[in-house]
Amino acid sequence: MGKTRRDLLVTGSRVAAGLAAANALAPTGPFGAAQALADPKSKLRRPGFGLAFKSLKDETFLPSIDLDGKLPQWLTGSLLRNGPALFEIGEEKFNHWFDGLAMLHAFSFKGGKVSYRNRFLRSSQYWAWQREGRIKFSELATDPAPDPCRQIFSGVSTLPVLGRIPNANVSIEKLAGEFRAHTEIPIPVRFNPKFLNTMGIGDAGEMQGRLGTAHPHFDPETRERFSYEVELVPPSGLRIVSEKGRTRRELAFIPQAMPGYLHSFGLTRRFVVIVSQPFNFNLSKFLSPDRGPIITNYEWQGEEPTRIILVDRQRGGVAHTVETDSFFAFHHINAYEHEGKVVVDVCAHKDAGVIDALYLKKIRSGSKVPQARYRRFEIRLEGQGKMSQRDLIDAYIELPQKNYGRVNGRHYRYAYGVGLRKGSSGFIDQLVKADVKKGESKLWREWGVYPGEPVFVPRPGGKAEDDGVILSVILDGRRRKSALLVLDARNMEEIARASVPHHIPFGFHGLYAS
């Protein structure tokens, strides 16, 4: 693979080196890469970026896609991805990136070749598109056109009698051999990983909460699955639950008059870690006649603290609560216990403004999206429970991944994510490998290419934490199509890429299934 295919950087103070490397990527055209990246008025600074939020309506199966490079022989499974792919239905438009119709993607590896398949999740919203040609159900930031029959809680109702299949466009979970798509409504949608056909919703026992997490945790040692549910109506609050087989246990219920928005949580050997942030649900506003979509009923109350709550996994109940200045986080990176402290690493935003920045009108216009810092909190378990915090690396990071099976809930060194180059405007333009031991990062960046979540796949038998590959679905704006990028996870150098003949809209999360 020639050096003109990648821009490999090691962060620190090497801005000049980064620009020099970008110059080596100069495309054909009136501007070199470095100039286009640096000049905010340059039309070339984000070529093809509009495709990231352009609908993809076609479902397809490609038994073999173009491959540049050579795949590791041990890579024989499938990368499964989830994300929005349809942003309008007829004349009606979804408002937010989080609202688009869910599409599943599968890149499968066999005999050194790569096949590709995509398929819409057959949600109730999907069938409304097919049968009625309209947006029928509420999403996070989009309500359907006025309908006198619409129930006030239609956007968040999880009652199984409704037969509602949610638009589960966020993440994928493998549990007991079953593959499930998730969103923040706690009804998983089962699907076949080979053909991507929708197989129905999960058990009714999982539907007690109004909202839930798209990122449950599974502990392979205890065989427990952990999640939470948020009750928006009285008695409102946060319920922490664990499941083992068919046994479900409520670890804690934390009353909250105005429940805060949650997307993920952390897990250590002893604790469930909740970051309760002051982006609070206003029930009275939600019940008013002029209420808007569900997310518009949340209010950022930055004068309130963000609370880190530790729930005891074995005994149940809240073991510790500490407070810090307000911040907002979608994603936990990791959490673990070390030398009498609980270490909590998150992608920390200044406030909840990132949600507003991800409305489609704003993001398509090229508005800069607020970026998250790699922030560590250390909570002492003895005495007054004092807490310290610091940012671990200089680079921004979001959509974090790690060697999950090896280090989740345990002491670790490496994490991976997406980010935006310092000083640039826009959304995402690089992949990040964080070394929290050294406080350094390695970056992969290529001009005009926009990467997605990096999924780490460990090499069978590998001893080092970072011995494996990174799989990231990238949008090549210059060629106006997407590809699967394969990097060596140790040095972030490209091994191969497999291209599809069309664009794939920006997605959220996925996993590798062997």
Please annotate each region the language model reported.
Residues 91-92, 279-300, 349-368, 420-423, ...:
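Short, conserved, GDST-rich strand-edge loop motifs in beta-rich repeat architectures
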Residues 23-70:
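C-terminal segment of N-terminal export signals and the immediately downstream linker at the start
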Residues 193-207, 243-256, 307-325, 377-396, ...:
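Blade-edge beta-strand/turn elements of extracellular beta-propeller
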Residues 238-245, 289-314, 359-381, 429-436, ...:
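Beta-propeller blade signature
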Residues 387-477, 485:
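Substrate-recognition/cap regions that form aromatic- and gly/pro-loop-enriched pockets
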Residues 68, 158-175, 212-221, 264-266, ...:
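Structural signature of eukaryotic scaffold interfaces centered on beta-propeller domains
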Residues 127-249:
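Well-ordered mid-protein domain cores that form the structural environment of catalytic cofactors
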Residues 1-19:
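N-terminal secretory signal peptides and thylakoid transit peptides that target proteins
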